[in-house]
């Protein structure tokens, strides 16, 4: 990538979010209410090769959001800021993104339909959690990065190139949207409908915390009962060899 391309991605992805947030805050601070939903990504926690500009912009968004949230808490403001971290989505992005890959670009599987992201964003707007992770793959990437970042380096160095391409050579002369929007309505879905998932069990659990807590308690009780019974059985065997 050229330096001006890095600048453009940063201006659109990071500064675009910052300027939009500042505009919303001007109204929300006056009323002392409102929810700002930042659209993040698993890449805000773990960068991958071939997307360094985008990953850096998403991580900058996360840093900006954390600072802003703390400032609002300090002000005792009732304006809340949440960030929804998304997995790979089946959007038209991969048909218009500037790419120098030898084959056509694709999102790193598993791929989800954009409706899954929409459900998460609406829920975050209504409930304003600090963060909301969408998809087990997002949770896995964030957790593994925290526990074993070096392992992630090695894994991505081996797998991330092929994971971001699919069959068919890329057309180096096709139009892209780096410097200007493309004409026409391209819809919300990309070309991966046959592979994309239209639901996320992980998101359902994340947005139904009472059910998750109840299941965890039930599992703990069951484990305790099993352990107690096993202990009594072992005691009987010792007492009556």
Task: Describe the residue ranges of each PLM region.
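Active-site loop immediately N-terminal to the catalytic Tyr-X3-Lys motif
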Residues: 2, 46-53
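Active-site helix of classical SDR
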Residues: 21, 57
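Active-site Tyr-X3-Lys motif and surrounding loop/helix of classical short-chain dehydrogenase/reductase
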Residues: 4-11
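Hydrophobic alpha-helical topogenic segments used for membrane insertion/localization
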Residues: 205-232
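SDR active-site lid
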Residues: 71-168
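A short helix-coil junction within the Rossmann-fold of NAD(P)-dependent oxidoreductases
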Residues: 23-32
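Residue(s) in the substrate-gating loop at a strand-loop-helix junction
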Residues: 41
């Amino acid at each position: 990538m050229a330096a001006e391309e890095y600048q453009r991605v940063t201006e659109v992805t990071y500064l675009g979010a910052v300027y939009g947030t500042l505009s919303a805050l001007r109204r929300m601070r006056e009323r002392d209410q409102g929810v700002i939903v930042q659209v993040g990504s698993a890449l805000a926690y773990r960068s991958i090769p071939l997307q360094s500009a985008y990953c850096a912009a998403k991580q900058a968004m996360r840093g900006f959001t954390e600072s802003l949230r703390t400032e609002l808490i300090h002000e005792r403001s009732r304006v809340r800021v949440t960030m929804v971290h998304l997995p790979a989505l089946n959007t038209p992005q991969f048909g218009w993104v500037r790419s120098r890959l030898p084959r056509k670009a694709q999102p790193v599987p598993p791929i989800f339909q954009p409706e899954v992201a929409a459900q998460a964003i609406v829920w975050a707007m209504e409930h304003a959690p600090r963060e909301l992770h969408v998809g087990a793959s997002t949770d896995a990437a964030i957790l593994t990065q925290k526990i074993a970042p070096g392992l992630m380096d090695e894994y991505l160095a081996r797998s991330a190139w092929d994971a971001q391409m699919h069959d068919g050579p890329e057309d180096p002369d096709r139009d892209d949207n780096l410097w200007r929007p493309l004409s026409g309505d391209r819809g919300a879905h990309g070309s991966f409908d046959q592979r994309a998932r239209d639901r996320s069990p992980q998101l359902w659990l994340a947005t139904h915390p009472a059910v998750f807590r109840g299941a965890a308690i039930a599992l703990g009780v069951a484990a305790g009962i099993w352990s107690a019974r096993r202990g009594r059985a072992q005691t009987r065997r010792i007492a009556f060899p």
